[in-house]
Amino acid sequence: MSQTNYIPSTPNKSTPPSELSSTPIDENDIGLLVSLNQEISSNIHVKIKIEENITIGRSKTCNIVVPELIVSGKHCIITRADAIENGNTNYGLLMIQDQSTNGTFINGKLIGKGKSRLLKNGDKLCLGKSTKEIDISFLYKSNYSNQLLLSSSTNNLNNSGTAQYIWERKDIKDDILKDYDFIKELGSGNFSVVYEGVNKNTGKRVAIKHLNLSKINTHTPKFKSQLNREIEILKFINHENVVEIYDIFYTKDQQLFFILELANGGELYNKIGFNEPLLNENQSKFIFKQILNAVSYLHSKGIAHRDLKPENILFDSYGDDYLKIKITDFGLARFIHEGELAKTLCGSPLYVAPEVILSLHHKNKYGTNSSSSSQSPTKDINSVGYGKSCDAWSLGAILYIVLCGTPPFDDDDDEEMSTPQLFEKIVSGNYRVEKLEKSLISSSAADLVKGLLTVDPDKRLTVEQALNHPWITEINNNSNNNNNNINNNSSNINIIKKSPLKTVNTNNNNNNCKLSSPIKNSSKLKRNLSNEPLNNNISNNNNTQTSFTGSLLNQLQLNEGELLKKRKTFLSNNDQKENINPVINNPFLKSSQ
């Protein structure tokens, strides 16, 4: 900024916050620094582009000149903290760097020379320490304040004269607010809320996951000791395909906060089509190998994810051609009581391994303290090995959905299926193998899916075996380099927006590809929940297990015929998926994060 503005010397006369609403705002500005002294002739219009800065000080070389002795030659520097990149919304956030001798203050707190602090809507900026003789202070009014987490009350100013934010009423602790500001809520689940935040000192965008453990765990010393061990393990996770954990806060009242790397390219969930996939086989392979590498790394650290699903697989950046992924929410299930896990199954059952369902059934039948190995149908639900095999199953379900565009355990003839019926299909391995075989994918890809969707965990492919599967090892070597743009892997790999048939890489002369459309399963899923064995006409190379839904209904507190939350699907009224007609009912479940 080349223009220099002079602000005259003024006595101390403050303007009440209630009178600030009449101050005109230029919509082309980022915001206004509204003078809190009536003798200052004009406010400071913050017109600033990305990577530009505004200097405020006594020197004539500054953009904003304040000729007061308390103000240093170059007192502070204002930069944008909300650069618009990768599709991010502009939130009107500013970063203030203190360059002064007498101090720059935000809401009465000294920034410190050479240090920076975030300035958000409603904050008070003061040049030098306020005294009775002089007070050079401003109230920042962002033109984008309606996009921040302001409270819904008519008076957005608290007793200190600064904006009141939603998290101030949500038990978000001072330890977190010392270093981070919360911008907006990204999503919520049964036990957690995820916010987009920003580091006050650096302006770096982060994701903040808030887990309220007081609702789901005990206060025993044993649990707290285990929690500390788990936190220490998670802090040392470092992999290019795993969302980085910057910091973890744990409060005395069992509030857990994860400060996470922000992957803002959207979820894998948003690139799954309806009945026909949006990703071709080479793109699916490129993505799935990254997922396998990430899960393999976590397993090597003794961490089982336990909640793998497309919603927990994020793209690093926006764009159809940028397919680098990062998985998130790993290890969080280790902080959740097993009893609560049973409740979550009803909200996100599509990726649950058979042994998880059987384990819950076993504990309901024999009791949680049962140690009879002869009666137990599964491994210990809390063991690491158990979690690893469950992850492999979930990966198989994810790969099936990505390749086929529909979930493996679903009914072609009905949009609605009860949770017990879905569980019955899962534990019997009764997935739609004909859909997989008739889809336009290679036999090698289908073989990998079948190996992962094997009911017996001892016969199921491990993640390491999946990494060594021919479908993965034959991946183009170019996909292993550091340039993650998928266009470098093949000249013919483009995301197919909508097509009746899957398009594959034309450079791959695979004789196993079939051009026939998928055949619908003519057998309608039975609606009554009996104890009869399932129909075994379809063979998936799995060990079929008998029905147990009668007692499982009691374990999960479900009634016979109860539907999967009315099949909430991938498309809600307020949530439109990428490139998919919103009037179509997608047969997936929209599970909570």
Swiss-Prot record:
Residues 54-111 form the FHA domain. Residues 180-472 form the Protein kinase domain. The active site is at residue 307. Its EC number is 2.7.11.1. Residues 1-24 are annotated as: Disordered. The keyword Disulfide bond does not apply. One of its GO terms (molecular function) is calmodulin binding. InterPro entries: FHA_dom, Kinase-like_dom_sf, Prot_kinase_dom, Protein_kinase_ATP_BS, Ser/Thr_kinase_AS, SMAD_FHA_dom_sf. CDD domains: STKc_CAMK. Keywords: ATP-binding, Kinase, Nucleotide-binding, Serine/threonine-protein kinase, Transferase. ATP binds at residues 186-194, 209. It comes from the Eukaryota. The keyword Transferase applies. GO terms for biological process: DNA damage response; intracellular signal transduction. It catalyses: L-seryl-[protein] + ATP = O-phospho-L-seryl-[protein] + ADP + H(+); L-threonyl-[protein] + ATP = O-phospho-L-threonyl-[protein] + ADP + H(+). GO terms for cellular component: cytoplasm; nuclear envelope; nucleolus; nucleus. It holds the Pfam family FHA. Belongs to the protein kinase superfamily. CAMK Ser/Thr protein kinase family. CHK2 subfamily. PANTHER family: OVARIAN-SPECIFIC SERINE/THREONINE-PROTEIN KINASE LOK-RELATED, SERINE_THREONINE-PROTEIN KINASE CHK2. This is Probable serine/threonine-protein kinase fhkA. The lineage of its organism: Eukaryota, Amoebozoa, Evosea, Eumycetozoa, Dictyostelia. The gene is fhkA.
